[in-house]
Amino acid sequence: MVEDQSRYLESNINHNELIKLVPFMSDLPEDSIHKIAAHFVTISHPSNQVLLLENDWGGSVYFILEGWVKIRTYNLDGKEVTLNILGRGEIFGEMAAMDKMPRSTDAITLTKTLIGRIPAEDFVNLIETEPMAGVHLVQLMAKRLRQVNRRLQLREASSISRVADAILFLVEGQGTEGDKGGTEIPNLPHREISSLSGLARETVTRVLTKLEKKGLIQRNADSMRIPDLPALEETIC
């Protein structure tokens, strides 16, 4: 299994403090945090590292401490389909832990990434014994269902709407305030926005150029800045 084959060393950072940086864990009682920390492992991965493979059995649940992770599958034609792009503070691998079924997707890093993980049985025990953890899990499932519904509703929308929605999707998960105002996200490769929006990469490139010319986005090598989020939202119809 991929999750057991990492060649990267465990970090020595204080695990209690790292766990509190994850929204899912942030307001749990201290005794629950201590129990999680006892089996919490942190591992650094380079970009394009496969973390999990579809049909693997779920031995761990993962928390992103730094970086970006793509959750993907493949359609019947063998084409890659990006289901989600997760960033700092987000969680993955929880479904296989809860239903004790093989994993339904792959997970691969998009950037240098620091991952924390706990054994699946510890996660399940946390959900069963800590009410707030159960509430957080329901909220997480509801959020992801809303995101899927939104993307399905836009399947027949214009290419500009779909690319704008993909950008806003990333902003919702990991947008940060820019040094010059506005909101910033990492400037991911066009192929990732292509897979997320369901459009050809060439189409995504053209749309991004149009959005940049209109002043709705600004790009450099590392980041994309959205000066006015409501203005970008207005392009979705």
Outline where the language-model segments fall.
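Cyclic nucleotide-binding regulatory module and flanking cytosolic helices
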Residues: 1-47, 96-97, 129
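Cyclic nucleotide-binding regulatory domains
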Residues: 24, 49-112
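Short aromatic/basic micro-patch
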Residues: 27, 85, 117, 187, ...
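ATP/adenylate-binding site constellation spanning eukaryotic-like Ser/Thr protein kinases
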Residues: 30, 66, 88, 112, ...
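Cyclic-nucleotide recognition modules
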Residues: 33, 84-142, 146
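Polybasic "coupling" helices that flank or enter modular domains
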Residues: 128-198
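Phosphate-/nucleic-acid-contacting segments
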Residues: 170-237
